[in-house]
Amino acid sequence: VGAGDLFLFFGWFKEAELVDCNYCFKSDALEHHRIFGWMFIDQKLNVGSDTEEFRRKFTKYANHPHATGKWGPNNTIYLAPETFSLFGEHTIKGFGNFSVSKRTLLTNDNAPSKRFWSVPDWLNPAKGGCIPSYHDEKNYIGGLLKTAGRGQEFVCHPRQTKKFKGWLLELFNEEINKPNPTQKCETRN
């Protein structure tokens, strides 16, 4: 992983609603995995295990969580640019959050557990796609990916550039064209 790569972040969520200027989980909402954000890598800073030395050299990042405490030799900080060019077609913020949409949903309602995800074709080897790290073809059952119980991230190198590019462009087009709703709450004293 290095400069020019793109992180897509996923997590476990439950829908919330704003009630009297406080967010509360909706009682009838289903929990689900979804892709929630992105970060384009502009720079990779190898912090290593000597965080004190790193903080002396890079004072700008001294308060970053990976610049304090005890870490192993692979400890790394990734930096995003202000913007990047997505396939030369759009200028996108270097990092951000995706809106909730069907395209970002990974959980399959009919799956036996939350570990089974519906994934795009570029991430499905039966459709010519790539296999994420910590997985192999045995993890694909009935068209779903049974995710590994380990790791908080998976790495993959899309082989179907055309399908991946199309999927990613559609995902970012949703972001570019989304309305920007605002809701105001009064400050309490």
Where are these regions (language model features)?
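Short N-terminal edge-element motif at the start of the domain
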Residues: 1-32
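Contiguous surface segments at macromolecular interaction interfaces
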Residues: 31-36, 44-189
